[in-house]
């Protein structure tokens, strides 16, 4: 499994996703080697399958590091395929990547390409350079070539598959495999974190868990707090240098340990999932985790979010969450129905076990 953009340890969704996928496959008896930016000194592998192997590449931590770790990844994959027998290469793609599918095609090994978001849209939100014509054209060519070299692949939403098929129509044949959540960790019975006592909170709690990146509607979180002064808005996460303003009811508690996240969720009254009015094609981990803790969810109404939630969350247009939240919180019957519906849906349809089943099926079809 080739995932050079992934750092271990880290709290970003891509790390949580890839570790859960690799570990789940190892638990099913597959011999899995995960190539990533692995820090053996700081990584906690206590809860991972002991048979899951890691292949570490450099983690430069400098501008344009992607060029460096992608090139090293390609060399390492070639070396691995030349010295050991692998049945399939599973490559987590990104802009200017494809080290796994490229090496596999050169060594005569079958490969699949994993696409988790619209790389071009993510790139445009992260850097203005992506708007420049030469850069933009080279980026699109990278997307097209990765799809072309792969023997198969999957996206995490139907919307995303439609989007990337514009880069290369071959992607129309990709499978759709939604993300899952850890149903042994995110449970309604989790012991509360005690955040009410720690922060001396009165009234309802609205919670957001995740990185404060451009793909999340961070400004909308601020607006929710401003327009609802009696509501406690808790933001757990960090990254990307986004400093939230100081408001008396807005609490940015930073990153939590993984085990602390469900403890926070079960103490909250509603889970927030705001997004800008741009559909990246995500399969939102946070929403499934909210649901697993029986937390009612209010999210931005985007095609990919509709597909992910299937009517089990309250969806509102981008920018309108601040006015919708108090209406939902005041309707206890609706809150109860949302929490029960969300939990039933997530626990039966959105666990990692379901994701692993579909991934193994794709491997079998590709090999």
Residue spans for each PLM region:
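Conserved donor-binding/catalytic core segment of Leloir-type glycosyltransferases
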Residues: 200-216, 221-226, 234, 339
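Conserved acidic donor-binding segment of nucleotide-sugar-dependent glycosyltransferases
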Residues: 311-320, 327-333
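A charged, aromatic-enriched C-terminal amphipathic alpha-helix characteristic of glycosyltransferases
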Residues: 333-364
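Nucleotide-sugar-dependent
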Residues: 216, 257-264, 269-291, 299-311
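N-terminal subdomain of nucleotide-sugar transferases
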Residues: 1-46, 223-226, 302
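Short His-centered aromatic/hydrophobic patch
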Residues: 91-96, 115
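Membrane-proximal helix-turn-helix segments that form the acceptor-binding/catalytic region
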Residues: 75-79, 98, 102-106, 119-120, ...
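Carbohydrate-associated surface elements
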Residues: 159, 180
């Amino acid at each position: 499994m080739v995932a050079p953009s992934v750092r271990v340890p880290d709290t970003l969704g891509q790390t949580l996703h890839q570790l859960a996928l690799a570990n789940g496959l190892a638990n099913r008896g597959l011999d899995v080697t995960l190539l990533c930016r692995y820090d053996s000194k700081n990584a906690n592998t206590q809860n991972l399958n002991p048979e899951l192997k890691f292949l570490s590449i450099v983690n430069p931590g400098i501008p344009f590091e992607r060029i460096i770790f992608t090139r090293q990844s390609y060399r390492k994959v070639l070396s691995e395929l030349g010295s050991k027998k692998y049945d399939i290469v599973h490559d987590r793609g990104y802009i200017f990547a494809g080290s796994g599918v490229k090496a596999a095609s050169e060594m005569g090994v079958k490969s699949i390409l994993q696409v988790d978001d619209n790389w071009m849209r993510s790139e445009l939100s992260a850097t203005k350079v992506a708007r420049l014509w030469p850069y933009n054209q080279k980026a699109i060519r990278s997307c097209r070539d990765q799809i072309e070299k792969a023997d198969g692949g999957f996206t995490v939403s139907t919307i995303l598959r439609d989007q990337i098929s514009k880069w290369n129509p071959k992607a129309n044949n990709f499978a759709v495999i939604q993300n899952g959540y850890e149903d042994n960790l995110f449970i309604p019975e989790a012991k509360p974190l005690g955040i009410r006592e720690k922060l001396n909170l009165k009234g309802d709690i609205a919670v957001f868990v995740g990185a404060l990146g451009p793909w999340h509607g961070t400004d909308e979180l601020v607006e929710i707090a401003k327009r609802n002064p009696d509501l406690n808005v808790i933001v757990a996460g960090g990254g990307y240098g986004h400093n939230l303003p100081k408001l008396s009811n807005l609490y940015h508690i930073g990153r939590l340990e993984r085990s602390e996240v469900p403890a926070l969720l079960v103490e909250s009254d509603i889970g927030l999932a705001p997004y800008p009015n741009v559909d990246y094609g995500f399969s939102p981990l946070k929403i499934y985790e909210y649901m697993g803790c029986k937390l009612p969810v209010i999210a931005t109404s985007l095609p990919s979010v509709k597909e992910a939630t299937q009517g089990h969350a309250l969806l509102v247009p981008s920018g309108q969450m601040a006015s919708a939240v108090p209406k939902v919180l005041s309707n206890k019957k609706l809150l109860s129905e949302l929490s029960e519906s969300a939990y039933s849906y997530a626990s039966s349809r959105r666990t990692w076990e379901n994701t692993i089943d579909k991934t193994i099926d794709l491997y079998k079809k590709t090999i």
